[in-house]
C-alpha cells in the first residue's frame, strides 16, 4: 500500500474552487499587459508604423508558439511528478519572467522573455488535468465547464485593469503588479490545493506509443485535438479585424474604441453564463451532443455576422456565439477525460493545449490574410466554413462510438 492511500479523501470541490481562482489570477495576469503591448514595444525603441505592427505581432505570437512546443514536456513531467508541482512551477516561473519584462531595455530582451513566458506557462492545462483526475466522471462536464470560466473571467477583467493601471502608474509598473498576482497564485496553490500523487519513475512512464495504445479511441482523441485547434482558429480569425469592422459599421462616431471593446467582451460574458450550465447538461445527455450542437449553432451565427448593418446586430450575434463557445472546449475536455486514463491525463491535456496554442497563432494570421485580400465580411464566411468542416469531421469521429457508462 502506498503512503498516499492512508491519507483522507481529497475534497475535490474545494480543489475546484482553488483551481478556479488560480485560473482566474493567471488569466488576469496574462491579459493585464495586452492593452498596451504595442505601446511598450514602441517604448523599447521600435519606431515606424510597419515595424511597430510587425514587432507587436511577433512578441504576441511567440508566447503561444513556445507554449505549444513546451506543453507536451510539462504534461509528461506532470504525469511523473504530480500536477500540483506543475501548477507551482508555472505560477512562480511566470511571475519571475514578468518582473524581468518590466526591466527589459530593448526589444530583443523583451522578445526572449515573451518566449520564456510561453515555455514556463501551462497553469491552465495542468489545472484541467488535476480536476479531471479528481472529480467523479459523471460530473466532469460541469466541473471542467466551471473551471473554464475562471480563465475567461480573468481575461475579461485583465484588459480593463491593465489599461487603468497603465494610465495611472505607467507601463513598466504593470509588469510588477502582474508578477505580484502570479506570486499570489503560487501561494494560493501551495497552501490550498491538495493532491494525492505517487511519483512515477522515468522507467515506469508510458512512452508515446504506449500512450496511444492505452487510449480507448486514438482517432477520436486526435479529432478532439483538431477540434480544439479549429475552435481557436475561429476565435482568433476575427480578433485582428473586429475594431476595423465595427468602425465600418458605426460610421463617424467618436466612441468607436468603447463600442469595439464592448463587442469584443460580450462573448466572454456569455461564455461565463453558459459554460457551467451546458457542462451540466452534457453530463446528462452526453458531451458529444453538446459539442456538435454548439458547432452547428456557431456556423449559423457566423454567417449572418457577414451581413450585419449595425454594431448592435453584431454585438447580439457575438453574445449568442459566446454562449455556444462556452460549451465547446469543456465538451472537448470532458470527452478527453472519458477516453483516457488518469495515468496520462497530464500529457493528454498538454497535447490539447499545444493544439490550442497553434490555433491562437494561426487564427489571427488567417483572419488578417483574408481581410487584406477579400474584405472584412469574407472573414466571417470563411470562418463559418472552417467550423462547418469541423462539425462534420467531429460528427463523423463521434458517431462510431458510444460514451461509456460513467459512475461515481
Curated annotation (Swiss-Prot):
Function: Confers resistance to fosfomycin and deoxycholate.
Record keyword Manganese present: no
CDD domains reported for this sequence: MFS_MdtG_MDR_like (cd17391)
InterPro entries documented for this protein: MFS (IPR011701), MFS_dom (IPR020846), MFS_MdtG_subfamily (IPR050497), MFS_trans_sf (IPR036259), Mutidrug-R_MdtG (IPR023692), Tet-R_TetA/multi-R_MdtG-like (IPR001958)
GO molecular function terms listed in the Swiss-Prot or TrEMBL record: transmembrane transporter activity
Pfam families: MFS_1 (PF07690)
Chief subcellular location: membrane
Provenance organism: Escherichia coli O7:K1 (strain IAI39 / ExPEC)
Organism lineage string: Bacteria, Pseudomonadati, Pseudomonadota, Gammaproteobacteria, Enterobacterales
Membrane topology: Multi-pass membrane protein
Family recorded in the similarity comment: Belongs to the major facilitator superfamily. DHA1 family. MdtG (TC 2.A.1.2.20) subfamily.
Residues passing through the membrane, by range: 16-36, 58-78, 92-112, 115-135, 146-166, 173-193, 224-244, 256-276, 290-310, 319-339, 378-398
GO BP annotations listed: response to antibiotic
Record's protein name: Multidrug resistance protein MdtG
Assigned keywords, A-Z: Antibiotic resistance, Cell inner membrane, Cell membrane, Membrane, Transmembrane, Transmembrane helix, Transport
Highest rank taxon of the organism: Bacteria
Amino acid at each position: 500500500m502506498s503512503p498516499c492511500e492512508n491519507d483522507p479523501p481529497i475534497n475535490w470541490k474545494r480543489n475546484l474552487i482553488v483551481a478556479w481562482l488560480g485560473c482566474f489570477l493567471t488569466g488576469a495576469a496574462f491579459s493585464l499587459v495586452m492593452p498596451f503591448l504595442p505601446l511598450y514595444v514602441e517604448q523599447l525603441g521600435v519606431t515606424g508604423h510597419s515595424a511597430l505592427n510587425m514587432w507587436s505581432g511577433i512578441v504576441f505570437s511567440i508566447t503561444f508558439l513556445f507554449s505549444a512546443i513546451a506543453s507536451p514536456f510539462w504534461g509528461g513531467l506532470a504525469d511523473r511528478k504530480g500536477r500540483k508541482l506543475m501548477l507551482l512551477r508555472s505560477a512562480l516561473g511566470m511571475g519571475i519572467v514578468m518582473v524581468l519584462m518590466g526591466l527589459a531595455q530593448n526589444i530583443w530582451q523583451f522578445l526572449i522573455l515573451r518566449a520564456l513566458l510561453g515555455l514556463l506557462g501551462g497553469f491552465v492545462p495542468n489545472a484541467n488535468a488535476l480536476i479531471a483526475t479528481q472529480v467523479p466522471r459523471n460530473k466532469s462536464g460541469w466541473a471542467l465547464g466551471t473551471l473554464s470560466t475562471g480563465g475567461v473571467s480573468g481575461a475579461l477583467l485583465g484588459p480593463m485593469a491593465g489599461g487603468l493601471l497603465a494610465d495611472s502608474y505607467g507601463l513598466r509598473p504593470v509588469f510588477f503588479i502582474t508578477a505580484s498576482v502570479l506570486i499570489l497564485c503560487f501561494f494560493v496553490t501551495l497552501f490550498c490545493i491538495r493532491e494525492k500523487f505517487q511519483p512515477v519513475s522515468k522507467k515506469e512512464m508510458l512512452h508515446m506509443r504506449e500512450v496511444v495504445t492505452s487510449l480507448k479511441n486514438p482517432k477520436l482523441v486526435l479529432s478532439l485535438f483538431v477540434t480544439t485547434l479549429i475552435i481557436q482558429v475561429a476565435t482568433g480569425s476575427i480578433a485582428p479585424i473586429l475594431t476595423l469592422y465595427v468602425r465600418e459599421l458605426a460610421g463617424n462616431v467618436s466612441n468607436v474604441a468603447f463600442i469595439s471593446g464592448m463587442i469584443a467582451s460580450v462573448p466572454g460574458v456569455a461564455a461565463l453564463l453558459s459554460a457551467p450550465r451546458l457542462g451540466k447538461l452534457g453530463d446528462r445527455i452526453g458531451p458529444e451532443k453538446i459539442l456538435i450542437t454548439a458547432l452547428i449553432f456557431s456556423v449559423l451565427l457566423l454567417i449572418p455576422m457577414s451581413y450585419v448593418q449595425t454594431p448592435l446586430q453584431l454585438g447580439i450575434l457575438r453574445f449568442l456565439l459566446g454562449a455556444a463557445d462556452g460549451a465547446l472546449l469543456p465538451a472537448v475536455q470532458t470527452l478527453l477525460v472519458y477516453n483516457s486514463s488518469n495515468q496520462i491525463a497530464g500529457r493528454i491535456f498538454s497535447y490539447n493545449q499545444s493544439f490550442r496554442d497553434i490555433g491562437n497563432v494561426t487564427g489571427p494570421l488567417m483572419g488578417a490574410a483574408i481581410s487584406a485580400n477579400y474584405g472584412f465580411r469574407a472573414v466571417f464566411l470563411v470562418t463559418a466554413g472552417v467550423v462547418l468542416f469541423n462539425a462534420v469531421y467531429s460528427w463523423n469521429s463521434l458517431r462510431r462510438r458510444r460514451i461509456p457508462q460513467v459512475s461515481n
